[in-house]
A protein has these predicted regions:
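Fe(II)/2-oxoglutarate
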Residues: 1-21, 253-271
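Short, functionally important structural connectors and interaction interfaces within domains
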Residues: 5, 15-18, 23, 135, ...
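Catalytic core of non-heme Fe(II) oxygenases with the double-stranded beta-helix
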Residues: 86, 94-248
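Short, flexible segments with low predicted structural confidence
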Residues: 8-12, 68-69, 120-122
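Non-heme Fe(II)/2-oxoglutarate
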Residues: 15-108
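Aromatic-glycine hotspot motif
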Residues: 7, 38, 116
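Amphipathic alpha-helical surface "interface" segments used
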Residues: 59-65, 116-127, 253-262
């Protein structure tokens, strides 16, 4: 992977404004250099390279990116995705995103305490499994509000449209109509029980990244879209082992440790 591409992306992520409400997130524009983004669009795999989720999510086609899986892609695109997968699953890429959210990650310590012990690789570090899904969603795809699975801590969505024709086929964030509703395990809820705060549009060369919490409610609105397919790459590192993750990474436990009183206070007020 070209170092210029990496540095462009890292700078775009660092410059993105971190918003704390309703949960920590960033929306990055022009995350990749224009020329590289055009090449990426040309290298999107053909439909027959994708697997299909079982009902009721059969409108989502996917490729779980890993060294062994990218090797099986159509020859014309395989090398590109092999290099891209190696980059976004690198220690370097992981650390850029973790540093962006920083001590905010500690607010979930009460949920993660046992997992940090179970997945420790040393007294100081915990195992992290890099994992990504390249998906193609078709016209009737929708997802009810959910907070995401328990082993995740940061979730990224690279949007790869060719133009703005599917811009409303984005990711929405929500708050529950009952403010007391939170959920760490993350069942999929009904849209009608939530207020939509904002929809992050499916625009070319953008990326939404958010922090998993017990109130990181997000989903996809029910709408009738054209059936050309929405191309998105979900970057979803997980604490511990994960299916399909072939090269484990690690992070210092301090990123997830019990926050001090001052840390809790500054995080609460959005410092």
């Amino acid at each position: 992977m070209n170092n210029q591409v990496k540095q462009h992306a890292y700078q775009a992520i660092k410059n993105a404004k971190l918003v704390s409400v309703p949960f920590p997130h960033i929306y990055v524009e022009k995350v990749l250099p224009d020329e590289f983004y055009s090449e990426l669009l040309d290298k999107l795999p053909p439909d027959n390279d994708y697997d299909i989720y079982p009902a009721p999510y059969e409108q989502r086609h996917y490729i779980q990116l890993s060294p062994s899986r990218t090797a099986k892609l159509t020859e014309a695109v395989s090398q590109f995705w092999k290099e891209f997968e190696a980059w976004i699953h690198s220690q370097e890429f992981l650390e850029v995103l973790v540093e962006k959210f920083g001590k905010r990650l500690q607010v979930n310590y009460k949920y993660r305490e046992k997992d940090l012990v179970k997945n420790a690789v040393s007294d100081e570090c915990v195992r992290v499994s890099p994992r990504s899904l390249l998906v193609r969603d078709y016209q009737n795809f929708a997802l009810g509000p959910h907070t995401d699975s328990e082993s995740k801590f940061i979730v990224g969505a690279f949007y790869f449209p060719k133009d703005d024709s599917l811009r409303d086929f984005g990711t929405s964030i929500y708050t529950p109509k009952d403010p007391a509703v939170t959920s760490w395990p993350s069942p999929h809820m009904k849209h009608e029980d939530f207020n939509r705060v904002k929809t992050f549009e499916n625009r070319p060369n953008t990326m939404l990244v958010f922090m998993k919490t017990d109130h990181s409610w997000h989903g996809v609105e029910r709408k009738q879209h054209s059936n050309v397919g929405r191309d998105v790459l979900f970057w979803i590192p997980q604490i511990g082992a994960a299916a399909g993750a072939e090269i484990p990474l690690q992070l210092p436990k301090r990123w997830f440790s019990k926050p001090s009183f001052i840390d809790r206070l500054t995080t609460k007020i959005g410092v």
